[in-house]
Amino acid sequence: MPVHSRGDKKETNHHDEMEVDYAENEGSSSEDEDTESSSVSEDGDSSEMDDEDCERRRMECLDEMSNLEKQFTDLKDQLYKERLSQVDAKLQEVIAGKAPEYLEPLATLQENMQIRTKVAGIYRELCLESVKNKYECEIQASRQHCESEKLLLYDTVQSELEEKIRRLEEDRHSIDITSELWNDELQSRKKRKDPFSPDKKKPVVVSGPYIVYMLQDLDILEDWTTIRKAMATLGPHRVKTEPPVKLEKHLHSARSEEGRLYYDGEWYIRGQTICIDKKDECPTSAVITTINHDEVWFKRPDGSKSKLYISQLQKGKYSIKHS
């Protein structure tokens, strides 16, 4: 077989291309001649073809616009339906309790609820304990107040009775009381009958005016003492037949002058803090509130008030000093 080199192949290809170009040039020249010959005949119909072409293109554009509008409307409806279906699906998940957008806030709310419930329980227990403590404090305070009032009442009654006994003793020593009153009292007591006995007491017939005594024996005795004192002051010229008075010796010096209290060489006024000492009892502190002729009122630290007779200070039952 004959072998051709690359240079031979290039020359062959170049020769072929020259032949093709020559043929094309001949064809184009022939076409130009035909075009020139037919251009004269087609000049008359060019205007009609342009109008038809424009109308045809306009119709095509309108059709294309209507198609585009229809496609846009269809796409919009399809997108709306897809979005609506997605929202419905998400709503169903929320209703069923499966949506993550619902589960995460729900878990946070439940955790907060548990924490607040625990805190409320602790606060409730603390409130109950506080109320219980207040109740116990009130009960204890009421009991202590009752005990202090009982002691104060006991001391007051005891002091009043001692004062009455002292006055009766002073009257007994200073005034001659006839024995007839005591004899009459004893006889009346002997004549008294049992109120539950079946015997009925016969009415006593009294002629003329009479006096019914409704007073107690102690009141009668006090009235009798007052009358005897008045008679003694009105008739000093009379010869007294009373026995010599035996005055009770006071252990301490105590008296009140112009709202002040004098006791064992010291003066006490209202508002001062004193220390009260009683036999067989612990000393207590108090504040003087009132100083009368024969008694002194003072206030204890717990707020209770009580009185102290000057005669008790004189006898040594109580003693006071500056605190």
Curated annotation (Swiss-Prot):
Chain positions covered by the region annotation Disordered: 1-56
Composition bias, Acidic residues: 18-53
Top-level taxonomic group: Eukaryota
Positions of modified residues (Phosphoserine): 197
GO cellular component, one term: Sin3-type complex
A GO BP annotation: negative regulation of stem cell population maintenance
GO MF annotation: an example: histone deacetylase binding
Record's function text: Involved in the histone deacetylase (HDAC1)-dependent transcriptional repression activity. When overexpressed in lung cancer cell line that lacks p53/TP53 expression, inhibits cell growth.
Self-association state and partner proteins as the record states: Component of the Sin3/HDAC1 corepressor complex at least composed of BRMS1, BRMS1L and ING2/ING1L. Interacts with HDAC and SIN3A.
Protein name: Breast cancer metastasis-suppressor 1-like protein
Organism: Homo sapiens (Human)
